[in-house]
From Swiss-Prot:
Entry similarity comment: Belongs to the bacterial ribosomal protein bL34 family.
Source organism of this protein record: Shewanella woodyi (strain ATCC 51908 / MS32)
Chain positions covered by the region annotation Disordered: 1-26
Keywords: Ribonucleoprotein, Ribosomal protein
Protein name: Large ribosomal subunit protein bL34
Biased composition (Polar residues): 1-10
Gene Ontology cellular-component annotations: ribonucleoprotein complex; ribosome
Domain of life: Bacteria
InterPro entries in UniProt: Ribosomal_bL34, Ribosomal_bL34_CS
Pfam family, one: Ribosomal_L34
């Protein structure tokens, strides 16, 4: 049996995919812009 590879951590999740992480880079801002244009209810994790 192999172990489950997804070991959730709220801190790691927020640091890599959170709103402030997105806003920190130009490409991250583009991600948010695309999601706003698409009409997503949640822009980031």
């Amino acid at each position: 049996m192999s172990k489950r590879t997804f070991q959730p951590s709220t801190l790691k999740r927020k640091r890599s995919h959170g709103f402030r992480a997105r806003m920190a880079t130009v490409s991250g801002r583009k991600v948010l812009a695309r999601r706003r244009a698409k009409g997503r209810a949640r822009l980031s994790a």
